[in-house]
């Protein structure tokens, strides 16, 4: 299930291209309209920055290793919302955030384009098979549909994702030339798992979308819990660049990740997030040993739960002794 976005890549494009022709209607509602020239075309580059250096706690190495799903987005008006912080996600976005299944979300986007006339175009980019790397595509925006939203699932995770909600690429009467944004993890509010590899544990009743921070959820088991940090480093970045060439027919990007290449993030530019050692509680004291009439010794132990990394606090002593009166002395 975790790699379903990789397998659905080509089918996703076929579906998206079929939708584009039917989702270019005018929006409903009375929102202000962008007065920029009729159409603008942008390249969008998504860069994953999810490295073991920046996010050492419980970093997924196997089954599956850290990676990103395909990117799915839409150019739309204010009548449509793909997702929004502090609001409930749709069933389609729930399926995408939990399992990487895009079909229901794509159907919702199609319905918004046909019924609400609020979606101008949809776009997608291939998945990234590692935590660090990049993927890209192109999108077209229209003065009446100048907002852009997208989501990318964090794999593996219970229901965590990154994305953009209703970014306006129009500013007054002009299209923005470039937009660069750092991205941070969000919880879709549909699964209560605390760690990347948590088993499915539905949130009942469903919660709203929340941003995951270094201190929230405030639980040591959470994979993003770093109490020494004021804020998490960005886990991804997205760049929109306006293309100067005249509009042309929409063409999907190459689905060959090898030809595009994955950006390997320079380790010198990645912040080192300190990970402190975590140990268990002490065990019970053992029996007191020693000769009768003299003080003996007893001991207890604890074990390392999380090894320190990136100059985090080192582990304390794992064994402790104390004087005692010998047990069962005759």
UniProtKB/Swiss-Prot annotation:
Localization in the cell: Secreted, Extracellular space, Extracellular matrix
Spans traversing the lipid bilayer: none
GO cellular component, one term: extracellular space
SUPFAM superfamilies, per database record: TSP-1 type 1 repeat (SSF82895)
PROSITE patterns per record: SPONDIN, TSP1
Domain Spondin intervals: 30-220
Tissue expression from the record: Detected in heart, lung, thymus, spleen and lymph node.
Binding-site list for Ca(2+): 159, 187, 191
Subunit structure and binding partners: Monomer. Interacts with integrin.
Protein name: Spondin-2
Protein source organism: Mus musculus
